[in-house]
Swiss-Prot record:
Quaternary organization: Forms homodimers.
PANTHER family linked: PINORESINOL REDUCTASE 1-RELATED, PINORESINOL REDUCTASE-RELATED
Record-listed E.C. numbers: 1.23.1.1, 1.23.1.3
Name this polypeptide is given: Pinoresinol reductase 1
Organism for this UniProt entry: Arabidopsis thaliana (Mouse-ear cress)
Length: 317
């Protein structure tokens, strides 16, 4: 049933299309054969890279729709064009933090009344499991929960895509903070380095998102991205890199209390980052719960040949 449904063309609007994950979702939707629309907000007029991205989307076959979060009716008109809305609004402290702006999108979808599914901006840790998260990083999860509650209160059909660390931020650097490149000599290991973590290439996250958005099996469900070969400990990730380079790194184990020391004195974005790293690498928040095959992306869509972390790390050689 799911397979036949996904061969049909679905009209999709991507909001936040020029963002880090948004641009990948646009391309994945086009590759999946969806009739893809992207929301162009008037304020991007002087941002040359975003303008060029929109032009590249247009060249690939996407349709540009103008709309503004300060103009409710323009949002209603935009969502009336499509069956599915996917949001990729930024929700991290070191970039723009726009999670609650999605409430305006919820209102527009509610008024339009035609949208068959909404995928809000998620893609990371599962917010209902993060009520205990350290501030200020918890703000992201609290706000995502606020958006979820608004979606469900409005009776809008949904799919939540969660569960993985973006490889570019967590794998290429062997999970080191303050760099996106692999360390050359020394590597910090969180605790004993044996907590299981989920890594995923961002293009694969986008592919799974494009496949799940019209799949009846995932309607009103949470889809976890947990590709089995990419469920690794930090030590296993480091060992993959050491095998590729033929060089052993000097390892320094950092106890939890040392990792969190002086967090209150740090800048807010750094505090949030420390908190997220703590929950992932010390608590194991991505893997401390079971996920059924009908809830896991790589099981639902085995045709996606996801990138393993050894292949991912080869890019840095």
């Amino acid at each position: 049933m799911g397979e036949s449904k996904r061969t049909e063309k679905t009209r999709v609007l991507v909001v936040g299309a020029t963002g880090y994950i948004g641009k990948r979702i646009v391309r994945a939707c086009l590759a999946e054969g969806h009739e893809t629309y992207v929301l162009q907000r008037p304020e991007i007029g002087l941002e040359i890279e975003k303008v060029q991205l929109f032009l590249s989307f247009k060249k690939l076959g996407a349709r540009i729709v103008e709309g503004s979060f300060s103009d409710h009716q323009s949002l209603v008109s935009a969502v009336k064009l499509v069956d599915v809305v996917v949001s990729a609004m930024s929700g991290v402290h070191f970039r723009s933090h726009n999670i609650l702006v999605q409430l305006k999108l919820v209102e527009a979808i509610k008024e339009a009344g035609n949208v068959k599914r909404f995928l809000p901006s998620e893609f990371g840790m599962d917010p209902p499991r993060m009520g205990h998260a350290l501030p200020p990083g918890r703000e992201t999860f609290d706000q995502k929960m606020e958006v979820r509650q608004a979606i469900e209160a409005a009776g809008i059909p949904y799919t939540y895509v969660v569960g993985a660390c973006f490889a570019a931020y967590f794998a290429g650097n062997l999970s080191q903070m303050v760099t996106l490149l692999p360390p050359k000599e020394k590597v910090n290991i969180y605790g004993d380095g044996n907590v299981k973590v989920v890594f995923a290439d961002e293009d694969d996250i986008a592919k799974y998102t494009a496949k799940t958005l019209n799949d009846p099996r995932t309607l009103n469900k949470t889809v976890n991205i947990r590709p089995p070969d990419n469920v690794l400990t930090q030590l296993e990730l480091v060992q993959i890199w050491e095998k590729l380079t033929g060089k052993e790194l000097e390892k320094t184990n950092i106890a939890a209390q040392d990792f969190l020391a002086n967090i209150e004195q740090m800048e807010i974005p750094h505090q949030a980052g420390i908190g997220h790293f703590y929950h992932i690498f010390y608590e194991g928040c991505l893997t401390d719960h079971e996920v059924g095959e009908d809830e896991e992306a790589s099981s639902l869509y085995p045709d996606v040949k996801y990138k393993r972390m050894d292949d991912y790390l080869r890019m840095f050689l």
